[in-house]
């Protein structure tokens, strides 16, 4: 039976991204809530972040700066995911992106999705009218809408190689 590690502490600050605005979510970011309005863009860098409630409205956009690199978001609250992912290779994005839901609140994923969701205590509602999803999903109950297509992509982040040069 899958179990969750302890939920990270959630800060008391909230972040909203409005029309024509963008924000870069980066390693160690921590928000009580994050909302991206229609026309707003969320750039996501590799790392590990913690968010209470997340709401990505229809018409919002997401761009992974380094698709495939390990990117984990810990959630501890409600999830509404209606955004469009701007990256071309959604399979590569899915290999590096994972959400861990620590609460039992229902997660609604209506927009494009690429990544794994680990939410053993939460219900998942996936896909709406001809949406395509890439990744793996674990939830208490999972509902997949009739027009959704899911492609199995394992969480298997790419490794960043570093080259060190020495001079004698």
Name every feature range the model reports, one short phrase each.
Residues 1-10, 162-168:
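Boundary/junction segments of secreted and surface-exposed precursor proteins
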Residues 4-5, 9-12, 18, 24:
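Hydrophobic alpha-helical segments and helix pairs
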Residues 16-157, 168:
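Long, polar low-complexity repeats
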